Curated annotation (Swiss-Prot):
Transmembrane segments: none annotated. The lineage of its organism: Eukaryota, Metazoa, Chordata, Craniata, Vertebrata. GO terms for cellular component: mitochondrial inner membrane; mitochondrial membrane; mitochondrion; myelin sheath; nuclear body; respiratory chain complex I. GO terms for biological process: aerobic respiration; mitochondrial electron transport, NADH to ubiquinone; mitochondrial respiratory chain complex I assembly; proton motive force-driven mitochondrial ATP synthesis; reactive oxygen species metabolic process. The gene is Ndufs3. It holds the Pfam family Complex1_30kDa. It is a peripheral membrane protein. NCBIfam families: NuoC_fam, PRK06074.1-5. GO terms for molecular function: NADH dehydrogenase (ubiquinone) activity; NADH dehydrogenase activity. This is NADH dehydrogenase [ubiquinone] iron-sulfur protein 3, mitochondrial. PANTHER family: NADH DEHYDROGENASE [UBIQUINONE] IRON-SULFUR PROTEIN 3, MITOCHONDRIAL (PTHR10884:SF14), NADH DEHYDROGENASE UBIQUINONE IRON-SULFUR PROTEIN 3 (PTHR10884). Residues 1-35 form a transit peptide. It is found in: Mitochondrion inner membrane.
Length: 263
């Protein structure tokens, strides 16, 4: 009986030792799982296209076009399942009001309002409204257009969040919003000339600000691009780094050495 108990006890010790030795080395299955996880991490985090979502967005865009045929000019769904509705400038308030109040839409949150400047177009400015529906967890993009002189109706009465957005578009692009309660610059300083986000705005601007120690205040002056005289050696384009050039043969000769004669 004692011998049998001793054999069982020895087997237990050997099994525990084998488990201890194996604990330090990952099993084949664990190595396979780690390789799969490493391969999955390298995949691009791009949302896959859903045919069901694409069809639903297309159907909703066609529905909006049927309800507002006077204003909706184009409906399109991008490859990433993003619905875009292009409307006439006169239909900004009716379209956004419909999208906010309709039961099947409820786009009550204005996520962003911006503009794009395309100087080659007749109506160079593209106004973009990004709307969010918390009820249906959906987004929609409404686009319209304008030029330098034609104003766009303000949507502050529809979305109060558009107040500062429209001020920013006016400041950066110069698009005027009609019936805005307080349309003034929001990012640039008082008396700023021009609109920085226009494609024809110079990179240096028109004026520069500096502190004048004589008058003890900040003064605005026309931009002066003063540059010191620089001499360029254009003999060889490969000698841009003189410190790394090969030293001439005369510098290699020590004092008293004679230059070897060439045959």
């Amino acid at each position: 009986m004692a011998a049998a108990a001793a054999r069982v006890w020895c087997r237990g010790l050997l099994g525990a030792a084998s488990v201890g030795r194996g604990a330090g080395r990952p099993s084949v299955l664990w190595q396979h799982v780690r390789r799969e996880s490493a391969a999955a991490d390298k995949r691009p985090t791009v949302r896959p296209r859903s045919d069901v979502t694409h069809k639903q967005l297309s159907a909703f865009g066609e529905y909006v076009a049927e309800i507002l045929p006077k204003y909706v000019q184009q409906v399109q769904v991008s490859c990433l399942d993003e619905l875009e509705i292009c409307i006439h400038p006169d239909g900004v308030i009716p379209t956004l009001t419909f999208l906010r109040d309709h039961t099947n839409a409820q786009f009550k949150s204005l996520a962003d309002l911006t503009a794009v400047d395309v100087p080659t177009r007749q109506n160079r400015f593209e106004i973009v409204y990004n709307l969010l529906s918390l009820r249906f967890n959906s987004r929609i993009r409404v686009k319209t257009y304008a030029d330098e002189l034609t104003p766009i109706d303000s949507i502050v009465s529809v979305h109060i969040a558009a107040n500062w957005y429209e001020r920013e578009v006016w400041d950066m692009f110069g698009v005027f919003f009609f019936n805005h309660p307080d349309l003034r610059r929001i990012l640039t300083d008082y008396g700023f000339e021009g609109h920085p986000f226009r494609k024809d705005f110079p990179l240096t601007g028109y004026v520069e600000l500096r502190y004048d120690d004589e008058v003890k205040r900040v003064v605005a002056e026309p931009v002066e691009l003063a540059q010191e005289f620089r001499k360029f050696d254009l003999n060889s384009p490969w000698e841009a780094f003189p410190a790394y050039r090969q030293p001439p043969e005369s510098l290699k000769l020590e004092a008293g050495d004679k230059k070897p004669e060439t045959k």
